[in-house]
Amino acid sequence: MISLLQMKFHALLLLLSKVWTCICFMFNRQVRAFIQYQPVKYELFPLSPVSRHRLSLVQRKTLVLDLDETLIHSHHNAMPRNTVKPGTPHDFTVKVTIDRNPVRFFVHKRPHVDYFLDVVSQWYDLVVFTASMEIYGAAVADKLDNGRNILRRRYYRQHCTPDYGSYTKDLSAICSDLNRIFIIDNSPGAYRCFPNNAIPIKSWFSDPMDTALLSLLPMLDALRFTNDVRSVLSRNLHLHRLW
């Protein structure tokens, strides 16, 4: 009799635990959705005639974007979730086959990434450049693009240069005119050959209150008017060591 009661009690605890986990999951998803689409954004104003004329005098520039820990963070089903708090909902999944083994990635989008891409795609030609394998990077880029055709140009691990256990990214392979190309990347090593063509950003894993992408918009809005991005970005060299 006592054993039966214990079994029922444990079953009840298990059920309550699952219900609580489900409630926490749904609550966290709603919080993330609210933060992602909250109306506090970078306000865009129509350009004045003077600004339009100034912009017409310079060439349209190329903005290169890293993926992992810059725009998104992911973990796969064979890797412990030590970078993401338990119960944090993912935004989408990516299923790929690596070395004949099926791998499922759970992908978390950095807060405001959709709005960020919408805005900067109006100012720049966007390029994805990731040190990840193409089969994974392409699937993630497809999800971020979401049918908008703003992330059509993509470079992957095979386009990187091996460098002491890591990878560097050759921006000149994308655009030989270095005065109109720059990269946003959380890893300074990735652009160490092009420090004057880079904007550092702090690595992101799961902080739902992160506003790094929004914070970059005023600078990116102004940078499109310059003749040479290096004239501005070369002043940021001290920032690359912070990340």
UniProtKB/Swiss-Prot annotation:
What GO biological process, any one, is recorded here?
Answer: positive regulation of triglyceride biosynthetic process
Q: Which SMART domains match?
A: CPDc (SM00577)
Q: Which UniProt keywords apply?
A: Hydrolase, Membrane, Protein phosphatase, Transmembrane, Transmembrane helix
Q: Main localisation, per the record? A: membrane
In this chain the FCP1 homology domain maps to: 56-223
SUPFAM superfamilies from the entry?
HAD-like
GO molecular function annotations of the record: phosphoprotein phosphatase activity; protein serine/threonine phosphatase activity
Q: Where are the transmembrane segments?
A: 11-27
The subcellular location is:
Membrane
As its record notes, the protein acts as a catalyst of: O-phospho-L-seryl-[protein] + H2O = L-seryl-[protein] + phosphate; O-phospho-L-threonyl-[protein] + H2O = L-threonyl-[protein] + phosphate
InterPro entries, A to Z: Dullard_phosphatase, FCP1_dom, HAD-like_sf, HAD_sf, TIM50
One Pfam family here: NIF
Q: Which membrane topology describes this protein?
A: Single-pass membrane protein
The answer to whether the entry has keyword Transferase is: no
**What is the enzyme's main class?**
hydrolase
Q: What is its EC number?
A: 3.1.3.16
Disulphide bridges: none
Gene Ontology cellular component annotations, sorted alphabetically: cytoplasm; endoplasmic reticulum membrane; Nem1-Spo7 phosphatase complex; nuclear envelope; nuclear membrane
Task: Write out the coiled-coil annotation as residue ranges.
Answer: none
Q: What does this protein do?
A: Serine/threonine protein phosphatase that may dephosphorylate and activate lipin-like phosphatases. Lipins are phosphatidate phosphatases that catalyze the conversion of phosphatidic acid to diacylglycerol and control the metabolism of fatty acids at different levels. May indirectly modulate the lipid composition of nuclear and/or endoplasmic reticulum membranes and be required for proper nuclear membrane morphology and/or dynamics. May also indirectly regulate the production of lipid droplets and triacylglycerol.
Give the family per the record. Answer: Belongs to the dullard family.
Q: What is this protein called?
A: CTD nuclear envelope phosphatase 1 homolog
